[in-house]
Amino acid sequence: NLKIAILKGIDIRIEADARLEDLIIVDKKSKKENRMNFENKIQRITYEERFNEIIRKGKILHLDGDKKYANKSIIYYKKIGLNAVVKNIPENKQAKIIKQLLILYNPDILVITGHDGMIKNGELNNIFNYRNSRHFVETVKQARNFSKINGKDLVIFAGACQSYFEALISAGANFASSPARILIDFLDPLIVAKNVAETDNMK
């Protein structure tokens, strides 16, 4: 019988399957080096924020389809002093609950992310060729419509690895991934949120 493994990225937002016979076990040294590189990246950002003594007031609501990344995001936001609420919500349920969360938390910045990916190469303009882009698009639409009705200038980042960038922007996202349909770093959405929170109109 064919045995399939489900692979999840540690620092890259990817979830994929592969045959066991195609996999190579990573040695402990390589895993340790990768972990240290990632931790050093976070430490550099944290040091820069402390050095600059930036005060942030933009409130962030972060929806993440992956529980592990949601928990890591909480740690990251706390380390650099961002005012963030992180919720682990499956991609296909985010649109159903977004209005309720916007009412409850009244954020200035909304991050909508999780896992995504193209099913077949080449079909860039077919939203059904993406694992979760249609769910992200619907969540963006719901959030943008709600913000317009309530006169809120909500800044939205949406998407994950290989998401349908153009559809997300058309739906109302200010920032989205990924225009080149590439894999994105776990930190990418968080860094965008951080930069927006530091802008003058958020202070």
Summary of predicted features, one role per range:
Residues 2-21:
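Basic/aromatic-rich interaction segments and small domains that mediate binding to polyanionic partners
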Residues 29-88:
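Long, low-complexity intrinsically disordered regions
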Residues 82-103:
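Functional beta-strand-loop-alpha-helix junction segments that form "active/interaction loops"
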Residues 89-91, 179-189:
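Short, acidic/turn-prone active-site loops that include or flank metal/cofactor-
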Residues 95-97, 185-195:
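Short, charged, surface-exposed secondary-structure boundary motifs
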Residues 102-115, 173:
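Proline-aspartate-enriched helix->loop->beta-strand connector
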Residues 119-136:
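A short, glycine/acidic-enriched catalytic loop
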Residues 135-184:
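Catalytic cores of nucleophile-dependent amide-cleaving enzymes
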